[in-house]
C-alpha cells in the first residue's frame, strides 16, 4: 500500500462525484446521472417579460424560495427583420423600448412560483409588478444575485449583485449591494479584467474563508487572451476566469479555470459555479457549451422554429440561427482546478418546434432541496432552466435529481470494490446515500491505515435505496473517531452517492 497523507474528513459529507477519495478500486466507475424534467414553475408572459427572460439566481431566505430573473422580450424573428433592414440584432425590441427588468418570483415549495408584489416601478403603465431593479439609461444584460454568508459582511451588503457594464475603452463588472434583496444600490466597479457579457457569479467559501468570482473572457485558439477591441464572436473562444478575495475589495486574478492539459478547448458560456449545499468540500457548475452547426445546415430544414423559415434565414441571422447549446457538469475541490464531463448533462430534448436553438440549456445559478412529489420518498434536488428562448414566452422549468446525485460510484452486477485513502472522522455513526437492486448490495468494512479490516466493523450486505441509511456495526464507531482509518466498499449492482460520519 503506497503512502498517502491522511485526509481530515471530520463530519463533512463526502460526495462520490470524483475519484479524489479513492486509493484503489476495481470494477467500479464514476457514473453521471441526468436530471428528470418535472414541471413549469413560471411562464414569463407578463407585458414586461417575454422570450428573452433568463439569467436566474436562486436564494433561500428563511422558508421562502426566491428566484430572480432577467425580464426581457426579443423574439428571434425580430432579429431577422432587423438583419433585413441592415441593422444588427439587439435588445431594442425588449420591454418598454429597451428597458430590461430584474424581477423576483417566490415559492413556498420550490415547485410553483408566483411573482412578488414589489411595486417599485411603473412599467408600461402598470405599477403592480415584480421588478426589483431597472436602469433608465443603460440596457441590463446580466444581473446575478447571491446571499453573502461571510459572518463579517455588513448587514447592508448581505445581498450582492454583479452586473456587466460597458465603458468607452473596456468592459466593467459593477457591484451592487442590498440589505434585503429588494433595493439595490451601486457600490463600486470591481478591479477585474474581462468581458463579462454573461452571467458572472460569486460566492463565499466557508472552508477557505474567501470569495470566489467566476467571470467571462475570450481567448484566441493559441491561448492568448483576446483584447476587447479584437473580439471575434465567431472564432474566439469564450472561457471562464476565476478570481479570489478576502474582503470583496482586493482581488487576485488566477486566469482561466483549469480543466487539465488534455481537455478540449471549447467555448463555454454561463458557468453557474457554486458550492454544494450539502458538502463544503466541493464546487459544481453547469456551463453551457456553444456549438455553431452551420457546417451541418441541412439539419435546420427539420429543426423548425415558429414565425420564419430557419433554414432559409441562416445566412441573414448567422450564429443566432445556427448555434445550438447544451450544458456540461463540472466539479472541483479547490475552485481553481475542475473536472468536466464530455457527455452533456442536459441537452435540448425532444424537438418541439421551439428548441435546439441558441439559448437552450441555460440553468439557474444554484439549486434547492425540495420535497419529493410522492409521499414517503426522500427530499430531492431541484434545478431550473428556461425553455422556449427567443421563440415564445420563456417557461422556467424544474428538473430534479436525487440528493447528492450528480454522480455516483457505480458497480455492475458482476461486482467491484472501492478502498478509500486514509482519513480521520468525527462522530459515532456512518450514514450512506445508496441504491441497489434486489440482487445487489454494498458491504462496508472499516479498515486500518494499511487497509486491513478492523474486527467488529463489518456491516454485512446492505441493500435498499435510501439517501440516509445508518450503517450498523458490531462495535462502536466512536472508538475510531480521530484515528486514521479507511473504508472499503464492496459493491454489486449498486450506486453509492455519498457518505457522512455524524453524531
Language model: regions and residue ranges:
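Carbohydrate-active catalytic/glycan-binding domains of CAZyme proteins
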Residues: 1-503
Amino acid at each position: 500500500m503506497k503512502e498517502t497523507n491522511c485526509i481530515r474528513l471530520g463530519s463533512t459529507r463526502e460526495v462520490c462525484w470524483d475519484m479524489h477519495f479513492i486509493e484503489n478500486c476495481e470494477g467500479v466507475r464514476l457514473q453521471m446521472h441526468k436530471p428528470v424534467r418535472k414541471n413549469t414553475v413560471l411562464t414569463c408572459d407578463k407585458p414586461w417579460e417575454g422570450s428573452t427572460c433568463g439569467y436566474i439566481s436562486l436564494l433561500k431566505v428563511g422558508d421562502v424560495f426566491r428566484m430572480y430573473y432577467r425580464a426581457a422580450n426579443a423574439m428571434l424573428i425580430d432579429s431577422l427583420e432587423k438583419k433585413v433592414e441592415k441593422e444588427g440584432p439587439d435588445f431594442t425590441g425588449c420591454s418598454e423600448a429597451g428597458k430590461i427588468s430584474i424581477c423576483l418570483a417566490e415559492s413556498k415549495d420550490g415547485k410553483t412560483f408566483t411573482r412578488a408584489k414589489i411595486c417599485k416601478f411603473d412599467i408600461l403603465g402598470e405599477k403592480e409588478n415584480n421588478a426589483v431593479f431597472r436602469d433608465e439609461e443603460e440596457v441590463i444584460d446580466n444581473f446575478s444575485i447571491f446571499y453573502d454568508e461571510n459572518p463579517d459582511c455588513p448587514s447592508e451588503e448581505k445581498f450582492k449583485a454583479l452586473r456587466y457594464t460597458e465603458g468607452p475603452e473596456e468592459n466593467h463588472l459593477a457591484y451592487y449591494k442590498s440589505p434585503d434583496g429588494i433595493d439595490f444600490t451601486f457600490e463600486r466597479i470591481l478591479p477585474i479584467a474581462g468581458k463579462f457579457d454573461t452571467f458572472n457569479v460569486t460566492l463565499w467559501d466557508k472552508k477557505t474563508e474567501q470569495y470566489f468570482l467566476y467571470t467571462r473572457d475570450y481567448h484566441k485558439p493559441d491561448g492568448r487572451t483576446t483584447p476587447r477591441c479584437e473580439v471575434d464572436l465567431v472564432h474566439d473562444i469564450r472561457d471562464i476566469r476565476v478570481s479570489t478575495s478576502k474582503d470583496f475589495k482586493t482581488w487576485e486574478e488566477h486566469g482561466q479555470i483549469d480543466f487539465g492539459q488534455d481537455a478540449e478547448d471549447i467555448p463555454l458560456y454561463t458557468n453557474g459555479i457554486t458550492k454544494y449545499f450539502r458538502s463544503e468540500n466541493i464546487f459544481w457548475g453547469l456551463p453551457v457549451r456553444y456549438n455553431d452547426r452551420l457546417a451541418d445546415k441541412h439539419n435546420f430544414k427539420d429543426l423548425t422554429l415558429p414565425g420564419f423559415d430557419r433554414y432559409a434565414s441562416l445566412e441573414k441571422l448567422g450564429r443566432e440561427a445556427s448555434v445550438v447549446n447544451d450544458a456540461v457538469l463540472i466539479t472541483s475541490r479547490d475552485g481553481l482546478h475542475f473536472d468536466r464531463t464530455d457527455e452533456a448533462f442536459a441537452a435540448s430534448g425532444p424537438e418541439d418546434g421551439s428548441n435546439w436553438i441558441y439559448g437552450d440549456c441555460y440553468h439557474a445559478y444554484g439549486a434547492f432541496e425540495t420535497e419529493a412529489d410522492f409521499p414517503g420518498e426522500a427530499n430531492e434536488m431541484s434545478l431550473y432552466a428556461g425553455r422556449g428562448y427567443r421563440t415564445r414566452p420563456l417557461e422556467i422549468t424544474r428538473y430534479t435529481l436525487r440528493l447528492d446525485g450528480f454522480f455516483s460510484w457505480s458497480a455492475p452486477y458482476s461486482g467491484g470494490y472501492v478502498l478509500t485513502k486514509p482519513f480521520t472522522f468525527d462522530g459515532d455513526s456512518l450514514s450512506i446515500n445508496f441504491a441497489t437492486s434486489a440482487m445487489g448490495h454494498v458491504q462496508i468494512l472499516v479498515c486500518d491505515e494499511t487497509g486491513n479490516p478492523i474486527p467488529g466493523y463489518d456491516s454485512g450486505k446492505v441493500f435498499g435505496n435510501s439517501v440516509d441509511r445508518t450503517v450498523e456495526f458490531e462495535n462502536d464507531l466512536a472508538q475510531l473517531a480521530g484515528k486514521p482509518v479507511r473504508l472499503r466498499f464492496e459493491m454489486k449492482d449498486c450506486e453509492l452517492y455519498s457518505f457522512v460520519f455524524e453524531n
